Amino acid sequence: MRLAAVGHEVVLGSRSAERAEEVRAGLLELWPGRELAIGAADNAGAAAADVVVVATPWDGAAPTVAALAEALDGKVVISMANALTRVGKEFQPLIPPRGSVAADVQAAVPGALVAAAFHHVPAKELGALDHPVECDVLVCSDHPTATEVTSALIADIPGMRALDAGRLTAAGAIESLTAVLIGMNVRYRTRLSVRLTGLPGE
């Protein structure tokens, strides 16, 4: 929604094109006064995009991209999933086989340029198009091109600032922090995001 709101053409993917169309129609109903270039397709159709964002539940991310490995070869793929589990009233981070969801995604599509990003942006804030999302987005990747492309997309969204968090080995810590933020959201009855200070030039 946010990327479509700033002029990018977005294609929603799902295992079935019909399901993707249902989601698309529901999103457009939320903002009837806006012209949003949002299409719908099955996962193979969505994988034809220049940049692919994987927004599945964490345990479905790697299998989903693995089935599309040929289509994703050479493309920037952005992983935004967090491996979390609920224990009682708390969310706790899980450690995927390769240390992070993003690393699992990269292993599933070795020819793709995987970046991890958008982990700490509240979903409701992303969908509230009438105001900016004031936050920093930590981006990490083993591919400079993926970091650059992802950071450029983030810069297009009002209020967001992309920060290069290094190689993909940082993704585990970045993803795990989400559990802390969710717990604080419950405690303070709010929707927290991340903003870092002390950067050069501030």
Please report, for each region that a protein language model flagged, where it lies by residue.
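NAD(P)+-binding Rossmann beta1-loop-alpha1 motif at the extreme N-terminus of oxidoreductases
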Residues: 1-29, 156
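Conserved Rossmann-fold NAD(P)-dependent oxidoreductase catalytic core, especially the SDR/UDP-sugar
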Residues: 77-99, 116
